[in-house]
Design a protein with these regions (language model features):
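Transmembrane alpha-helices
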Residues: 70, 154-178, 190, 194
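Membrane-embedded helix boundary and interhelical linker motif in transport proteins
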Residues: 1-55, 108
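Short loop segments and helix-boundary regions at transmembrane helix junctions
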Residues: 1-2, 33, 49-94, 128-133, ...
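Transmembrane alpha-helical segments in multi-pass inner-membrane proteins
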Residues: 170, 180-245
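Hydrophobic core segments of alpha-helical transmembrane domains in multi-pass membrane transport
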Residues: 11-15, 46-50, 76-83, 115-127, ...
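Short cytoplasmic-facing helical segments at TM-TM junctions of multi-pass membrane proteins
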Residues: 134-159
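Transmembrane helix-bundle core of multi-pass membrane transporters
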Residues: 29-40, 64, 68-134, 158-161, ...
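Cytosolic-side transmembrane-helix boundaries in multi-pass membrane proteins
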Residues: 150-157, 227-264
């Protein structure tokens, strides 16, 4: 549940470090700029910061035995508070072209960088979860954590790695959405964790764990975004769009639970 707030933190952190030198509201007036290398360094900083919060999530859930729902809910508030303290709730803008080009640029003039980045992340995650031991451990824990532990899987370590990996992806998402929008605020990413749950469920990921594919997640994200785009194209009022998205989330999860009960 801390996904959206980590996206916002990453977007704000990247924004404050990649503002134009002559921007009047610059957070760090004397911040040097080293071109593309600095943009890459800022991305690594965002990933590292979010990974720390992800590791804390994993430790709290694994070693303190706090339910994941409660642990990540608490982390959501912590990350939001950190972001408020860091930015003083001030909107951030005036980004350097080298940063915004990451999200708005195109390869060969027609392939968006964002598409290539999403494709690359999808391929890496597919390889990790289908060809590496960590992926098999993850599915085992999702299916039956007690059985996985008896089988010799280090469940605590695996869950911490899962939370760190997820946080790193949130950081990348925040970095990119900040570049795409050309500005950020503490409320960026608010509620996105629910959209993520809906997209994953639509893509065949079970909320009960142990079932799901990376390809399904990508399809689920595409379907959910097409739904939002269609509602906007049809001129549906924004307030009604939220209602429609909420219905999709409830129906998708309800159908998943019914399938789970039927299998049992």
């Amino acid at each position: 549940l801390s996904a959206g707030r980590m996206v916002g933190l990453s977007a704000c952190l990247a924004g404050t470090l990649l503002q134009k030198a002559d921007y009047s509201g610059k957070f760090f007036p004397n911040m040097p700029f080293y071109g593309v290398w600095w943009v890459a360094a800022v991305l690594l900083i965002c990933v590292a910061v979010c990974a720390i919060f992800g590791a804390i999530n994993g430790i709290v859930v694994s070693y303190l035995q706090v339910p994941a729902f409660i642990g990540t809910l608490g982390m959501q508030l912590i990350v939001y508070g950190v972001c408020l303290v860091y930015t003083n709730a001030t909107p951030i803008g005036g980004y350097r072209a080298a940063y915004t080009e990451v999200a708005k640029g195109q390869l060969f003039g027609f392939i968006p960088y964002l598409f290539l980045i999403a494709l690359a992340v999808g391929i890496v995650m597919w390889f990790v979860y289908n060809k590496m031991p960590h992926g098999k451990y993850m599915y085992a824990i999702g299916g039956n954590e007690q059985a996985a532990e008896v089988s010799g899987v280090n469940t605590k370590k695996t869950k911490i790695i899962i939370y760190i990996t997820a946080a790193a992806c949130y950081a990348l998402g925040g970095f990119l959405v900040g570049a795409k929008s050309g500005g950020s605020s503490v409320n960026m990413g608010y509620g996105w964790e629910l959209e993520a749950i809906a997209a994953c469920t639509i893509g065949g990921v079970s909320v009960n764990g142990g079932i799901g594919r990376i390809s399904g997640v990508l399809i689920g994200v595409l379907v959910f975004e097409i739904l939002k785009t269609c509602l906007q194209y049809l001129g549906v009022d924004t307030n009604y769009q939220y209602i429609a998205q909420g219905i999709v989330i409830v129906v998708a999860i309800a159908l998943d639970i019914r399938k789970y009960i039927a299998k049992k």
